[in-house]
Regions:
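Interhelical loop/hinge segments that connect adjacent transmembrane helices in multipass membrane
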Residues: 1-10, 186-189, 204-251, 293-296, ...
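Membrane-water interface segments that mark the loop-to-transmembrane alpha-helix transition
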Residues: 8-24, 62-115, 125-132, 304-324, ...
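Helix-loop junctions and terminal segments of transmembrane helices
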Residues: 62-78, 153, 212-217, 276-314, ...
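Interfacial/gating helices of multi-pass transporter permease domains
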Residues: 35-58, 87, 186-191, 227-235, ...
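Membrane-interface "helix-start" segments
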Residues: 13-16, 130, 159, 234-235, ...
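Short runs within selected transmembrane alpha-helices of multi-pass transporters and secretion channels
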Residues: 20, 24-28, 50-69, 133-152, ...
């Protein structure tokens, strides 16, 4: 693929992601405000907690998608359709295994809901219904539209974005209407969540069939085909540890907050995390569209071009992060006051800690390059990151509450993400060929 085509597709991915980012961010804020006003802060806290528990089950995905994406760069670059079919068949087989593990784990977890939600004042069916609907919605991706990875690896992620984010826009609008105008609004909210998720999965499958008419995958043959592609299993095993660290970073803080406080504080923290999540999603929308392009660049093997592009990305992302953090510092509390009320504003010290977290997350340039090279062998790093995160969050949270919990998260990010990962990338690249290896065959 020539540089112009790569740049064009990257820009199209970025533009599409940015468009839907703005639309869905606005709708997410409106939806959350409507949720609080019409259903109450505790229902919102319950929904957040159920999402975090589901995130725990999603660890079972093990990073298979990232491993598959890495192994698809070369056959797509070489236009090897047979290899693409076989690799995605392996993915389908692995995803079915993951789905069964998630279902089993969910069945076990449900028995503990009376203990997990014993402080909740809502009827217990709220917890069961919320969790089951979110679980089924998540399972659609494992059974129906797992093949979207081909579009993403082929730098056509904008088509996935149109379908998924367009469907999410429709979902937000329908859920807002249901909560505001219908009795038993939360029941309709859950029905819409499930129905739209199913429609999105089916629509995406139609797009994939139209775009890749030659893509014929057979998950039932995945068990045999995986022996031809040991790289997938190797990378998946390595990525498992990285997935755990990512889960700990994104999902455990609300659970620890709930353990020390209440669903109300979880929801207040969630309000700020919606803003922060919106900012980080904005940065990712601008830059993650380049991920397949970086993989394609690595496949070319031009060391000087890769190094030059890396430092350009560093400069741009640090500039972006600085401006965004300053803007957040000046505007966030005023916005929260207007949005949901002054009683939902966090203390200034807590807010400063959240800004430090935002800056570190928004400057993670190395992640895209590590993914393109498939360098996941530092399995001790995410294990240590998760250990520091959980251990320090629990310990510091006991003494300093929410500030201590966020401080534990920041400490783990500083040591592993800010210090180790850039060093690991440059050290590893210095001792390896700058070409994407072909997937080995037996």
């Amino acid at each position: 693929m020539n540089g112009n085509t790569r740049t064009k597709r990257s820009l199209k991915n970025m533009q599409t992601a940015l468009l839907f980012y703005i639309i869905n961010l606005v709708l997410a804020f409106i939806s959350r405000k409507v949720f609080i006003d019409h259903l109450g802060i505790e229902v919102l806290g319950l929904n957040t907690t159920a999402t975090n528990i589901l995130g725990f089950l999603n660890i079972a995905e093990l990073g298979i998608g990232s491993a598959i994406s890495y192994t698809l760069y070369h056959p797509l670059f070489e236009k090897d359709r047979q290899m693409v079919n076989e690799i995605v068949s392996v993915q389908g087989w692995l995803y079915r295994k993951v789905a069964y593990v998630m279902i089993l784990g969910a069945c076990i977890l449900i028995f503990f809901f009376p203990l997990i939600f014993k402080k909740m004042e809502l009827p217990m069916w709220y917890a069961y219904a919320s969790f089951i609907v979110l679980l089924v919605s998540s399972l659609f991706g494992y059974f129906i539209n797992y093949r979207q990875i081909v579009l993403i690896a082929d730098q056509k992620e904008y088509k996935v974005t149109y379908c998924v984010q367009g469907g999410k826009t429709l979902k937000y609008i329908l859920q807002i209407i249901a909560i505001m105008w219908l009795m038993h609004g939360y029941v309709y909210w859950l029905v819409i969540e499930l129905l739209v998720s199913f429609i999105i999965a089916c629509a995406l499958n139609v797009i994939i069939k139209k775009e890749y008419f030659w893509l014929n995958t057979y998950p039932s043959k995945g068990k045999l085909l995986r022996k031809k592609y040991p790289e997938i299993i190797t990378k998946t095993k390595q990525l498992f540890f990285h997935r755990i660290a990512a889960f700990v970073l994104s999902q455990t803080s609300p659970l620890i907050i709930y353990a020390y406080a209440s669903l109300t504080l979880v929801a207040i923290y969630g309000n700020y995390m919606l803003i922060i999540g919106g900012i980080t999603l904005f940065v990712n929308s601008c830059f993650n569209g380049m991920s397949a392009g970086i993989g394609n660049l690595v496949a070319e093997g031009n060391k000087a071009k890769i190094k030059s592009f890396y430092w350009e990305m560093v400069a741009v992302r640090y500039w972006f992060a600085s401006i965004l953090c300053f803007s957040l510092f000046m505007l966030t509390n005023s916005f929260v006051s207007l949005w949901v009320g002054e009683k939902y504003i966090l203390p200034q010290s807590t807010f400063i800690l959240l800004l430090i977290y935002v800056f570190i997350v928004c400057t993670r340039v190395h992640d895209l390059f590590i993914a393109a090279f498939g360098m996941y062998q530092d399995i001790w790093a995410p294990a240590l990151e998760a250990g520091i995160n959980i251990g320090c969050s629990i310990l510091l949270g006991y003494y300093w509450g929410l500030n201590g919990i966020i401080g534990g998260v920041i400490l783990s990010l500083l040591l592993i993400i800010f210090c180790w990962k850039p060093y690991f990338l440059f050290r590893s690249v210095s001792y390896t060929h700058l070409t994407l290896p072909t997937t080995s065959r037996v």
